[in-house]
Amino acid sequence: MNENIAEKFRADGVARPNWSAVFAVAFCVACLITVEFLPVSLLTPMAQDLGISEGIAGQSVTVTAFVAMFSSLFITQIIQATDRRYIVILFAVLLTASCLMVSFANSFTLLLLGRACLGLALGGFWAMSASLTMRLVPARTVPKALSVIFGAVSIALVIAAPLGSFLGGIIGWRNVFNAAAVMGVLCVIWVVKSLPSLPGEPSHQKQNMFSLLQRPGVMAGMIAIFMSFAGQFAFFTYIRPVYMNLAGFDVDGLTLVLLSFGIASFVGTSFSSYVLKRSVKLALAGAPLLLALSALTLIVWGSDKTVAAVIAIIWGLAFALVPVGWSTWITRSLADQAEKAGSIQVAVIQLANTCGAAVGGYALDNFGLLSPLALSGCLMLLTALVVAAKVRITPMS
């Protein structure tokens, strides 16, 4: 019965892709991600200006992720049948307001309030991203549209920290957030002009969010999502100490490694649609398997700089398939409840990021330099096995 509902949902979809709207969504996502990570490169001047420690100032990033987790879980319950066009506009307005609140903050409390506004927009937008995409393009074009959106994410992740640091040294951290507010205004304008009316879920289709986990293969999928992102953050959060102490990179060398990783991630995202068109399941199982082998390679031969640098590139290419692949899985296998599935997915990812970084840090402190790599490799291998054995992928109609 669920398959029939999904087929009907696809049949009622759009006939021609609305690429202007897709790029508007991608631009909004890029702006949200950029603003999320701006404080990482501006912590010192922010802390000095507000009279707080850098550790306290760093909580401006934590509060955004924390609010985003709850926003993603409850946003679909709150907005119900509201036209999604207005909701996306609201998120763009919240992005702009967040930047202005941070820019004019004269206290830590106002700073956190501004960053909480960003978390509301970030979590809500991510929860709706898959369902928005599948309503803007035909089913056959969804992987390509998702690769555009996640390509924007890759670009934002690459440029956010260095751009913030560069501009902060020239115009000051407050004006960096003022410039980000201008980007928010551009988001509002672009969304207003390009995004069509997207009515909310009819009342007869409403279903408890967590009842989706009872569908065959869905719980396994969410477990696989958790393990893959936890595995990523268990290692990548500590890539600096691992690469500097294991492979002997200096700061400049590490910068080049991270830049190579970012470029590889962008390339992987850009070409992900071609892989996913052939087999979503192969991509979702193959990518973590390749990452598990990469972790093993680093453990055995990571002291060689060339090997370590190549593995960073392979890691960026392979992991790029993971977020696009799981969003594609939602649009294929949970098409009739894509918003609610997206809400659970984003919450799972946020929790996985937190747990992966925390456990990876504990392992690094207590079991040595290679332990985050070993933890990451084990989680990636388990992900591949769960996907191969338990996750179901609905064929594209």
From Swiss-Prot:
Residues 43-54, 107, 169-175, 237-255, 303-305, 365-366 are periplasmic. Residues 1-21, 76-85, 129-147, 197-215, 277-281, 327-343, 388-397 are cytoplasmic. GO terms for cellular component: plasma membrane. It is a multi-pass membrane protein. It catalyses: inosine(in) + H(+)(out) = inosine(out) + H(+)(in); guanosine(in) + H(+)(out) = guanosine(out) + H(+)(in). CDD domains: MFS_NepI_like. It comes from the Bacteria. The chain crosses the membrane at residues 22-42, 55-75, 86-106, 108-128, 148-168, 176-196, 216-236, 256-276, 282-302, 306-326, 344-364, 367-387. This is Purine ribonucleoside efflux pump NepI. It comes from Salmonella enteritidis PT4 (strain P125109). The lineage of its organism: Bacteria, Pseudomonadati, Pseudomonadota, Gammaproteobacteria, Enterobacterales.
